[in-house]
């Protein structure tokens, strides 16, 4: 059976639409994580500039990220139980998110290791997430998200040249990165999902 060019394009478009629909429904997770990261960044920044337990300000990240992880895991387990009857395909982008997340967890330890560098941790945390989001943005042909990812790459490398006295602003830059990588597409997915829901 020979496929015509138009048939091939239809198949490709249907795969892209399935992926978009999956993430539109999960647009909640992108928004949830972006808000959580932005909140952690702003809280740590406020603790640092007001000198309110500055050495313990990193625990804000530990607490909020752990809560976010367990909440996400709980939601994922609940949704998996509901979809158990359906045959679900194994999405390779889920594995990319998983690897980037594990990488971020390990990178939290860098400032307390022999590297002793928050800038290195920032690079190691956000670079994989930026690659994952850019991969998805290119696959889904979402121009706004592609631009946000490219801007994130520029910020990641620009941050490496910040002088040590300016590291106090890294939590705010983390908030900006969360907005670029997660909040923008999350809102876009949510709006697309609402449009589709109203049309049906």
Task: Give short role names for the model-derived ranges.
Residues 1-27:
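N-terminal juxtamembrane cytosolic/stromal segments of multi-pass membrane proteins
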Residues 8, 38-41, 179:
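Amphipathic, well-ordered alpha-helical segments in soluble domains
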Residues 19, 23-26, 51-54, 115, ...:
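Membrane-interface helix-boundary signature
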Residues 21-109:
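Selected alpha-helical membrane-embedding segments in polytopic membrane proteins
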Residues 47-51, 114-115, 140, 162-164:
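Short helix-capping/hinge motifs at transmembrane helix termini and TM-loop junctions
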Residues 56-67, 112-127, 172, 176:
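Structural signature of hydrophobic alpha-helical transmembrane segments
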Residues 89-150:
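Membrane-proximal helix-loop-helix units in multi-pass membrane proteins
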Residues 132-200:
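Terminal transmembrane helical module of multi-pass membrane proteins
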